[in-house]
A protein has these predicted regions:
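A glycine- and small-aliphatic-rich helix-loop capping segment at beta-alpha/alpha-beta transitions
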Residues: 38
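Single, function-defining residue in the core of a domain
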Residues: 3, 15-19, 23-33, 42-286
Length: 286
């Protein structure tokens, strides 16, 4: 699949970063009476989808299904990190040993620092010509025994004022070449994986299940992920610019009517141009 995000593609070229990935999880809750094998949490059952999402191509790279009782950071040391790529996570993944696994893979990460983490400032790299939102840019090292044992090398800590939230946020990264404002900008792209989770839950029906066994549930979820990737591949091959949801609807028409998908796409795009805008916002526009 070709790159779909020109801003990230530009950053990839400018700073020699091979790829950008968001890592996050999403829970699916269900009734314990129908799924008694699930470990109860607050009176309900559930599963968790641990996902690595390709931000450049806007497709999932991998998905691991576990019980919803598993912590997000449990599998940090098992993800297939690639040399030269950058991984963006929320503070649930602030596990020093897991972050050092990314460092050892010669990859990069961006993650918000937790409030209770103790560190020593080694160097202040804040530049006077930084955007006003950049409050500080420092080189630090962990000082607590457990944190330093997990991550013994120096790190970069960027403090950035987020206007939308009305507060400052601090981001840890092992990339010392990116401008401080780009570190904060890249963290915003983590939202794309949330959009992906919302999309598959709404349109590929993974909130209700046909079977009640754990195996049946996993088959349905992995089928949904596979269907999403196939749709994305087909849309990319045909240079389709509309929403993936509309593309899926067009594919369903071609199952009952003998018509080329290319003709359906041309017909839809003509309708969209007549109306001024696509009928639905594109997932790939986020």
């Amino acid at each position: 699949i070709k790159f779909r995000n020109p801003q990230l593609e530009e950053l990839s070229v400018s700073f020699s970063i091979s790829g950008f990935f968001a890592i996050d999880s999403s829970s699916v809750k269900f009734d314990l009476s129908r799924y008694p094998w699930s470990v109860p949490q607050q009176g309900v059952g559930g599963i968790k989808l641990h996902t690595m999402y390709d931000l450049l191509r806007e497709v999932p790279r991998m998905c691991l299904i576990t019980g919803h009782e598993e912590r997000d950071q449990t599998f940090m040391e098992d993800y297939p990190y690639e040399k030269g790529c950058l991984y963006i996570m929320d503070k649930a993944y602030m596990k020093t040993k897991g972050l050092f696994t990314i460092e050892e893979a010669k990859a990069f990460f961006i993650v918000p620092i937790k409030r209770n983490v103790k560190y020593l400032v080694l160097k202040d790299d804040t530049k006077h010509d930084n955007p006003i939102e950049v409050m500080a840019d420092r080189t630090i090292e962990f000082t607590s025994r457990w944190a330093k044992a997990g991550y013994p090398k120096n790190l970069r800590l960027v403090t950035y004022y987020v206007e939308e939230k009305g507060k400052a946020m601090q981001f840890l990264t092992n990339n010392f070449k990116l401008p401080a404002e780009k570190v904060a900008l890249l963290y915003k792209y983590r939202w794309n994986i949330e959009v992906f989770f919302k999309w598959i839950k709404q349109h590929l029906r993974i909130n209700s299940f046909y079977g009640t066994s754990a195996n049946a549930m996993m088959i349905q979820i992995y089928t949904a992920f596979t269907a999403y990737c196939i749709l994305a591949l087909a849309a990319d091959a045909m240079s389709y610019k509309g929403s993936l949801y509309d593309f899926a609807n067009m594919i369903s028409v071609s199952l009952t009517e003998k018509v080329y998908v290319r003709d359906l796409i041309d017909r839809y795009q003509e309708m969209s141009e007549d109306k001024g805008d696509p009928l639905l916002p594109s997932l790939f526009d986020f």
